[in-house]
Amino acid sequence: MHINVRGTRKIISNVSSFTPRYEFPKYSMPLTDFKGHQVKALKTFEKLLPQMNMIIELRDIRAPLSTRNVVFDRIARKEHDVMKLVVYTRKDLMPGNKPYIGKLKNWHEELGEKFILLDCRNKTDVRNLLKILEWQNYELETNGGYLPMGYRALITGMPNVGKSTLINSLRTIFHNQVNMGRKFKKVAKTGAEAGVTRATSEVIRVTSRNTESRNEIYLIDTPGIGVPGRVSDHNRMLGLALCGSVKNNLVDPIFQADYLLYLMNLQNLNDGRTELYPGSTNSPTNDIYDVLRRLQVNKSQNEKSTAIEWTNKWRLHGKGIIFDPEVLLNNDEFSYKNYVNDQLEKLGDLSYEGLSNKLKGNPNQVF
């Protein structure tokens, strides 16, 4: 998808002569990072779904389109009785943007989806998710739904969107409730790079039976799953790269840095007090090499290492930047519902026989 955001919002610059780019070049890059262990995980999903009461799909709040996986949409539509909850992670990196949250609300209402925002390390946020699980379990029990195997939720999402961190946080809360004073051991590996979890984990208990519920609640952690090349494009791949949802070396760091610069200038987050990059307040630029020269702390630092350092800083700690340019479009210029339906049409009907060949495809294919 080639996005032109010209005219979609008023761009105000402290430098009146500066005009941001409204289109981003199509650099040559892989468009998918789909791997063999992900195919195996998807086959496992099909077997597990009849046992599940809820699918929890995690997405990065900064990239609601890039981290939405159409494969999960297809799976969820096969199991109509399974509730799906979308959880946007890294809420702390998108503070106070009410218009954006309002747009997300409208998008999900179009599709009849439920969603919440949270910081996977924030105990209050995580407890709120636990309350949702407990309430859904309570409603099921109220309608006579005793579950001998417990209430089960499958945690899914793109690589490195916070699945394992969330599970560890939920497990920590449970551990502290039943084992006061005893040391807690993580049950799911976490990391700053995509691909830490590579296999579907054992069932993880997060609540016990009590006077209010006969059902225990269990979670199943899963590896991050990418998308096939035919439902990806340059914007999606660059958005995933900035989120850390693909391997660092898959997309050229200069391309990533240039995309970040493009998004920064488009969104005009500059409030006149904080520099997004050196000179952004007084001398904004569309030239990524100019920005990299400004960022270099010494002459021995090359452009790629500077680009990696800058994008990593924003990936981990940068606040307020949206990584999907479609979010900047007006409602009459971009339809979320049409976007999702188009993705489903491109994906087609999937059977799990021969799934490896169907999904892997050519990493550079765009159809």
UniProtKB/Swiss-Prot annotation:
GO terms for biological process: mitochondrial large ribosomal subunit assembly; mitochondrial translation. The keyword GTP-binding applies. Gene3D superfamilies: P-loop containing nucleotide triphosphate hydrolases. It is a peripheral membrane protein. GO terms for cellular component: mitochondrial inner membrane; mitochondrion; nucleus. Keywords: GTP-binding, Membrane, Mitochondrion, Mitochondrion inner membrane, Nucleotide-binding, Transit peptide. Belongs to the TRAFAC class YlqF/YawG GTPase family. MTG1 subfamily. It is found in: Mitochondrion inner membrane. Coiled coil: none annotated. GTP binds at T89, R90, K91, D92, N160, V161, G162, K163, S164, T165, G224. Its main location: mitochondrion. GO terms for molecular function: GTP binding; GTPase activity. InterPro entries: G_CP_dom, GTP-bd, P-loop_NTPase. This is Mitochondrial GTPase 1. Present with 1630 molecules/cell in log phase SD medium. Mitochondrial GTPase involved in assembly of the large ribosomal subunit. Plays a role in expression of the mitochondrial translational machinery. Transmembrane segments: none annotated. It holds the Pfam family MMR_HSR1. Residues 42-228 form the CP-type G domain. The keyword Nucleotide-binding applies.
